[in-house]
């Protein structure tokens, strides 16, 4: 956790949540569930260089959780999301500038906490969750991106968060009692810094994707999505288009569209890490 006092890092690692008095009252607090006991980590692909940034790509849904479906029920979100996630992975690996891991590379179910904690356990530098949007209004279309906020930016964002966050319960994994086991720990300013970094990356995604794919007029939205709640990994959820809209569906199932999308994501990622490198270099130069 960059910029977090050693005491707080130690508390986070060992799960102690009783040291609230150790810091001034202006520190941010967060409730973090423990990592799953049997977390299965995926392989890290790309150059064998630990100094290169690691991007974790999460294909939404999977297994017995199909996600949303097309109007004719022939296409499922879980399949389209995985295909797009693979396209982004391949584009990143071809560039050779980052390392990549996927939360799932086949049709399997993962609870939301597993997806998030895979990124944390791998010490990822960026987490991107891939989804397809859906709406009763079949005229709705366009890509959008979500970053974490406890306050949703609008009713649609709130509905999305409610729908996605219920995925574990409706698929037989009831986490409603998890709050009894969590440790309440101080995260200092790390959570806020992570959220700010996530929002900055969302802006880069908008810049790189706007010229090539159709974006919603309100491209960047905020919601309390569980999968984005890693306190130390910048995270975004990318809605690649509406599976409920026939025109968007044709794009989502098109290799050409997937390639444009993957290129835009790759460019945004490269710009993101280039910006971070410049900022770190500038910080070192300012030291006495």
Regions of interest found by a model, annotated:
Residues 1-288:
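Catalytic-site microenvironment of enzymes
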């Amino acid at each position: 956790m960059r910029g977090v006092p050693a005491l707080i890092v130690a508390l986070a690692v060992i799960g102690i949540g009783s040291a609230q008095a150790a810091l001034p009252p202006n520190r941010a607090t967060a409730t973090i569930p423990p990592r799953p006991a049997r977390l299965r980590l995926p392989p890290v692909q790309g150059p064998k260089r630990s100094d290169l940034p690691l991007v974790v790509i999460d294909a939404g849904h999977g297994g017995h959780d199909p996600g949303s479906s097309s109007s004719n029920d022939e296409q499922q979100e879980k399949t389209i999301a995985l295909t797009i996630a693979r396209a982004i992975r391949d584009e990143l690996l071809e560039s050779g500038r980052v390392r990549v891991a996927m939360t799932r590379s086949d049709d399997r179910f993962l609870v939301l906490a597993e997806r998030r904690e895979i990124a944390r356990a791998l010490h990822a530098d960026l987490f991107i969750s891939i989804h397809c949007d859906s709406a009763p209004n079949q005229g709705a279309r366009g890509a959008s991106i979500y970053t974490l906020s406890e306050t949703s930016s609008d009713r649609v964002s709130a509905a999305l968060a409610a729908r996605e966050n219920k995925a574990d319960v409706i698929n037989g994994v009831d986490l409603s009692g998890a709050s009894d086991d969590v440790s309440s720990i101080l995260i200092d300013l790390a959570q806020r810094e992570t959220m700010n970094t996530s929002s900055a990356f969302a802006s880069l995604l908008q810049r790189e994707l706007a010229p090539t794919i159709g974006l919603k007029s309100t491209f960047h939205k905020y919601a309390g999505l569980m999968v984005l709640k890693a306190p130390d990994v910048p995270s975004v959820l990318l809605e690649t288009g509406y599976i409920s809209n026939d025109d968007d569906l044709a794009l989502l199932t098109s290799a050409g569209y997937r390639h444009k999308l993957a290129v835009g994501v790759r460019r945004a990622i490269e710009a993101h890490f280039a910006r971070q490198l410049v900022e770190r270099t500038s910080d070192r130069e300012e030291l006495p």
